[in-house]
Amino acid sequence: MVFRIASSPYTHNQRQTSRIMLLVLLAAVPGIAAQLWFFGWGTLVQILLASVSALLAEALVLKLRKQSVAATLKDNSALLTGLLLAVSIPPLAPWWMVVLGTVFAVIIAKQLYGGLGQNPFNPAMIGYVVLLISFPVQMTSWLPPHEIAVNILGFIDAIQVIFSGHTASGGDMNTLRLGIDGISQATPLDTFKTSVRAGHSVEQIMQYPIYSGILAGAGWQWVNLAWLAGGVWLLWQKAIRWHIPLSFLVTLALCATLGWLFSPETLAAPQIHLLSGATMLGAFFILTDPVTASTTNRGRLIFGALAGLLVWLIRSFGGYPDGVAFAVLLANITVPLIDYYTRPRVYGHRKG
């Protein structure tokens, strides 16, 4: 009998980076569809702007660095960066904002470090945070979901608002943000934080139209459930591992439950945390970035739990209504330390 001698590794994963990125893009379809349904065509326009900007920015840098443009663009990482940023910002944000954020994410947060695999921070979240800090008003100007909105825009009107700031009939963001109660609407998390600080009781807050959903905020609960469905599909396809999403969601739910039990007058209930904002998007599509997340199983559990704790702390006591982006970046900082202390022991070697 003849034995073939082969060098390690002895097991192989045939999935290329482009294949994994494509799976993530496909898994985003339910979440995108839900955002289109509840927040209008602006989401699609932002995705198109971000995608084109990401591809052009990456191609420009690769050309300047004299690297293969076609081969690198085929990995779909630039497209995914643009997509994640586009679905994270308000659907009617000015066109130049998504372009600026995407270009910053690709050139500064990714290519400046050497490209895919070298960046320590999630590029899409870097772009988001830069926009949020620089343009807080525009970045928090979300439309009310269609079920409680007074004005529902068509595709052409959405384009006009994004590029000119008003509709053909003269409507602007102030009128478009009005809900059925005649009050400018915000996200469920933003509404809760602002109302508590204004001295409103939780009973009063829960009567607002934005909380007319079955489980959490109107529209937002279904958007989060759609992102959850896409995330479960990614797990089924084995494109991501379960450790980070599970530890993130369990930690966030546990902290929110304990906080709500001890201080129900000032802290949001767990279902609002889990089904509002970017919770499910962050859990399955952002935190699971293989480049910027921990690489060991124990490390992934710690990484996800840390992010969940940070999200709850920022939402409950910080200055921003949704803390997913900041939590992701802060958790990214700790990855080298987490990996160092959770790396598995080499068989046959003792510690120390």
Swiss-Prot record:
Q: Which residues form the signal peptide?
A: none
Topology of the protein relative to the lipid bilayer: Multi-pass membrane protein
Which positions carry FMN phosphoryl threonine? 187
Q: Where is the major localization of this protein?
A: membrane
Write one Pfam family the protein is assigned to.
Answer: NQR2_RnfD_RnfE
Q: Does this entry carry the keyword Zinc-finger? A: no
Record's keyword annotation contains Transport: yes
- Which intervals of the chain form a coiled coil? none
Keyword vocabulary terms for this entry: Cell inner membrane, Cell membrane, Electron transport, Flavoprotein, FMN, Membrane, Phosphoprotein, Translocase, Transmembrane, Transmembrane helix, Transport
Q: Which GO terms describe its cellular component?
A: plasma membrane
This protein is called what?
Ion-translocating oxidoreductase complex subunit D
Q: What is the lineage of its organism?
A: Bacteria, Pseudomonadati, Pseudomonadota, Gammaproteobacteria, Enterobacterales
Gene name of this polypeptide: rsxD
